[in-house]
């Protein structure tokens, strides 16, 4: 009989900070490498203010990028994105492990006991917010580089200078407010649904290969469906040179593009995010189990 794989994200699990740092970094880098072209297309769709159907918008965007900018254009913004994914993966999983241990100690000290799914929701949200603070400037740089529709590539240095000229160093955090809601909530929901999926599928783990990947796919798809409108607001705000209120921007999108405007790029985002979560969580578990 096969030896059960350890779930390193479960409540009370123990793993060294070094191991979670390495595993989180590797999982982030691999996930980004797999989904980079999808991310570029998603960003272009989210920034479009044209009223196109989902299918037409996706097809036209892919064709336009390939025809006007070349195949390499699908990896525009990849350098800051790789840095962001590595840092985000390392910070997210490391802080998740640390917050999980701390919360477990609080439960023991004060005599209360959270359900594993609620434990994961609290810890996952905290880990997501921590990761956001560390990586957000790279997310903004990634968005601006990927949005460049010219055939030539902009450099990170040039974009940083543009941002500093218009908004100072604080400009690197333009759009952070909806991101606080989006990424924090998304991370919490992802870990929460992942643990629920793990509990439900526990009886099949010896018979179904890559069960962590299936659970991660479900977790990523569920969390993204709830938080995607906030992600669209974030992308729009990242491209602006002046401060814009979340409510004001949301009203503008609703008035000009309708409710669909908040979900532009959602289809490809789902294609991208679910595999990203699946690859990230699966690689994380594989690396830790191999260390």
Curated annotation (Swiss-Prot):
SUPFAM superfamilies xrefs: Mitochondrial carrier
One of the record's GO cellular component terms: mitochondrial inner membrane
PROSITE patterns, per database record: SOLCAR (PS50920)
Top-level taxon in the UniProt lineage: Eukaryota
Gene3D superfamilies listed in its UniProt record: Mitochondrial carrier domain
Gene Ontology annotations of biological process type: transmembrane transport
Positions of transmembrane segments: 12-31, 83-99, 120-141, 167-191, 214-230, 265-282
Solcar repeats: 15-102, 115-200, 207-290
Disulfides per UniProt: none
Membrane-protein topology: Multi-pass membrane protein
Compartments (UniProt record): Mitochondrion inner membrane
Pfam families: Mito_carr
Keywords of this entry: Membrane, Mitochondrion, Mitochondrion inner membrane, Repeat, Transmembrane, Transmembrane helix, Transport
PANTHER family: SOLUTE CARRIER FAMILY 25
Family per similarity comment: Belongs to the mitochondrial carrier (TC 2.A.29) family.
Function: Mitochondrial transporter that mediates uptake of thiamine pyrophosphate (ThPP) into mitochondria.
Protein's recorded name: Mitochondrial thiamine pyrophosphate carrier 1
Native source organism of the sequence: Meyerozyma guilliermondii (strain ATCC 6260 / CBS 566 / DSM 6381 / JCM 1539 / NBRC 10279 / NRRL Y-324) (Yeast)
